[in-house]
Amino acid sequence: MTVLGRSYRTYALDFWGFGESGKKRSTYAVQDFVSLVDQFMEQLGILRAPLVGHSMGGTVSLSVAIQYPHRVSKVVVVGSPIVGSSLALPLKLAGYRWIAYLLFNNMRLFRWGLRQASPLICRDPRFPDMMDRDLSRTTLESFLTSIASLRRTDLRPSLPSVRVPVMGMYGDRDNIVHPRQWETLKKGVPHAEIHRFPRAGHFPMLEEHQTFVEVLKDFLDKPEVML
């Protein structure tokens, strides 16, 4: 965001139940986050803008383009599941209440385990601390509901309705979301641009930062068109 902020006005939106956003809601489903983006733009008077989302954020961004096409000029998805079944098995299991409950009631052990596994997820040395910080700002309900909802998501039937420029950015070594989800995106949105990062996993913005920023900025700088 620092680099893009030199050329664009940028906003980082924390979904309900995550980061600095409110934690007192009855549901944290993908559809709730789609509505949140629409409401956020309405409140700030943003008529139309490019949306860039990582992981579930990209799934939400693409869903906004489908449900609120007047809001979106471009979409960039980064390591995002188009179909929820593409999530790694441990993540899908974490969407079940009893497993999520065990994890959150053994949070210290859970965080320790993730720290040990972090080199397998992302090579950037900053990643363990970033992950630990994010976990500390997440509730059991938001984690459980969002993962369970994402697991059931399937955008394939709606993809042909997307008429704005789309780019998918995927790491070939992703072990959180199946790295070939770019194929699903390309099949549903034939005009989508795809950029693959051979040496990156689920976090290409960290592992191949310079290339990531250059590719993203090049896409955003292109003239807006309706397809």
Language model features: what each stretch is:
Residues G5-V52, E214:
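Active-site loop/oxyanion-hole signature of alpha/beta-hydrolase fold enzymes
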Residues F15-G19, I82, G201-P204:
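Alpha/beta-hydrolase active-site loop signature
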Residues G53, G57, S61:
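Gly/Ala-rich beta-loop-alpha elbow adjacent to hydrolase catalytic centers
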Residues L62-Q67, S73-F104:
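Flexible "cap/lid" loop of the alpha/beta hydrolase fold
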Residues S86-L91, N105-S161:
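Conserved alpha/beta-hydrolase catalytic His-Asp/Glu region
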Residues V162, G168-Y170, D174:
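Short beta-strand/loop motif that positions the catalytic acidic residue
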Residues V164, H178-K187:
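Short alpha-helix in the alpha/beta-hydrolase fold that links the catalytic acid
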Residues A192-L227:
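Catalytic active-site module of serine/aspartate enzymes centered on a nucleophile-bearing elbow/loop
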